[in-house]
Amino acid sequence: MIKNTFSRKKYFALSRRMEKEEEEKKVALPINCPSCSARIAAEALQRNLKVCPKCQHHFSLSARERIDLMVDKDSFQEFDADLSSFNLLDFPGYQEKLEKAQELSGSREGIITGLASIDGHKLVLGVMESGFMMASMGSVVGEKVCRAVEQAMELSCPLLICSCSGGARMQEGMVALMQMAKTSAVLGKFNQAGLLYISLLTHPTTGGVSASFASLADIILAEPGALIGFAGPRVIKQTIGQQLPPRFQRSEFLLEHGMIDLLVERSQLKATLSSLLGLHQG
């Protein structure tokens, strides 16, 4: 009996050690750039803010990574962190998807909101989390966006929302679609209050998010190479039966056609935001 007990502990310890070694190997593996196929050391990519050093392809950031990149150290104060979705329409498998998304992303929902400062400039911030069901907009995402806007109005401070989304969350049906009108309405009040709203579009920003709050800002910024649009290019091509222009729906194309105001490299993001906030508040 004693022998068996020791054997189990030894096996458990060995198993944990092997798992740890496997995790370390995964972390150390080089990453292939999806744009230029360059092999990049994971540490080098992290040091370069997850931007390919050869072709400048911008890899996705988690919401927490983007917050750390943009705001002053220890200035972020999250609010509404306890809000999370539930299966209000009894959609098959939705509850399991929510639980899995929370586990994988470490976030309770598809957006994180809070108060922060950028070089001392106070603002309300919302950052979408692509790791949570592709940051699709359901009832809770819409509610958190609205509460962030209302908080900015109450404090009379600027609002910054960083978008990346696959669109409305299909598992919530019309409730998800209603969030487009809901967020647009509260932003209309924000605009009437004369306050500054900056929108940062990252890869990808599509569907109901691109057709609502992401496109209603006073200043619209975008990261290079981001896919931005309502329907995807393949759907549009099949619908109209024509070849699409090169780089169609990419941020560079939208800049050329007056749909966004400025392309911002990730390394310049905080400085650019600081300048815009300084001009507005100064």
Swiss-Prot record:
<keyword id="KW-0808">Transferase</keyword>
<dbReference type="Pfam" id="PF17848">
    <property type="entry name" value="Zn_ribbon_ACC"/>
</dbReference>
<keyword id="KW-0963">Cytoplasm</keyword>
<dbReference type="GO" id="GO:2001295">
    <property type="term" value="P:malonyl-CoA biosynthetic process"/>
</dbReference>
<feature type="binding site">
    <location>
        <position position="36"/>
    </location>
    <ligand>
        <name>Zn(2+)</name>
    </ligand>
</feature>
<keyword id="KW-0275">Fatty acid biosynthesis</keyword>
<dbReference type="GO" id="GO:0005524">
    <property type="term" value="F:ATP binding"/>
</dbReference>
<keyword id="KW-0276">Fatty acid metabolism</keyword>
<dbReference type="InterPro" id="IPR029045">
    <property type="entry name" value="ClpP/crotonase-like_dom_sf"/>
</dbReference>
<keyword id="KW-0547">Nucleotide-binding</keyword>
<keyword id="KW-0443">Lipid metabolism</keyword>
<dbReference type="GO" id="GO:0006633">
    <property type="term" value="P:fatty acid biosynthetic process"/>
</dbReference>
<keyword id="KW-0863">Zinc-finger</keyword>
<dbReference type="GO" id="GO:0009317">
    <property type="term" value="C:acetyl-CoA carboxylase complex"/>
</dbReference>
<dbReference type="InterPro" id="IPR011762">
    <property type="entry name" value="COA_CT_N"/>
</dbReference>
<dbReference type="InterPro" id="IPR000438">
    <property type="entry name" value="Acetyl_CoA_COase_Trfase_b_su"/>
</dbReference>
<keyword id="KW-0479">Metal-binding</keyword>
<dbReference type="InterPro" id="IPR034733">
    <property type="entry name" value="AcCoA_carboxyl_beta"/>
</dbReference>
<protein>
    <recommendedName>
        <fullName>Acetyl-coenzyme A carboxylase carboxyl transferase subunit beta</fullName>
        <ecNumber>2.1.3.15</ecNumber>
    </recommendedName>
</protein>
<comment type="subunit">
    <text>Acetyl-CoA carboxylase is a heterohexamer composed of biotin carboxyl carrier protein (AccB), biotin carboxylase (AccC) and two subunits each of ACCase subunit alpha (AccA) and ACCase subunit beta (AccD).</text>
</comment>
<feature type="binding site">
    <location>
        <position position="52"/>
    </location>
    <ligand>
        <name>Zn(2+)</name>
    </ligand>
</feature>
<keyword id="KW-0862">Zinc</keyword>
<dbReference type="GO" id="GO:0003989">
    <property type="term" value="F:acetyl-CoA carboxylase activity"/>
</dbReference>
<keyword id="KW-0444">Lipid biosynthesis</keyword>
<comment type="pathway">
    <text>Lipid metabolism; malonyl-CoA biosynthesis; malonyl-CoA from acetyl-CoA: step 1/1.</text>
</comment>
<dbReference type="Pfam" id="PF01039">
    <property type="entry name" value="Carboxyl_trans"/>
</dbReference>
<comment type="function">
    <text>Component of the acetyl coenzyme A carboxylase (ACC) complex. Biotin carboxylase (BC) catalyzes the carboxylation of biotin on its carrier protein (BCCP) and then the CO(2) group is transferred by the transcarboxylase to acetyl-CoA to form malonyl-CoA.</text>
</comment>
<dbReference type="InterPro" id="IPR041010">
    <property type="entry name" value="Znf-ACC"/>
</dbReference>
<feature type="binding site">
    <location>
        <position position="33"/>
    </location>
    <ligand>
        <name>Zn(2+)</name>
    </ligand>
</feature>
<dbReference type="GO" id="GO:0016743">
    <property type="term" value="F:carboxyl- or carbamoyltransferase activity"/>
</dbReference>
<comment type="similarity">
    <text>Belongs to the AccD/PCCB family.</text>
</comment>
<feature type="domain" description="CoA carboxyltransferase N-terminal">
    <location>
        <begin position="29"/>
        <end position="282"/>
    </location>
</feature>
<feature type="zinc finger region" description="C4-type">
    <location>
        <begin position="33"/>
        <end position="55"/>
    </location>
</feature>
<keyword id="KW-0067">ATP-binding</keyword>
<dbReference type="GO" id="GO:0008270">
    <property type="term" value="F:zinc ion binding"/>
</dbReference>
<feature type="binding site">
    <location>
        <position position="55"/>
    </location>
    <ligand>
        <name>Zn(2+)</name>
    </ligand>
</feature>
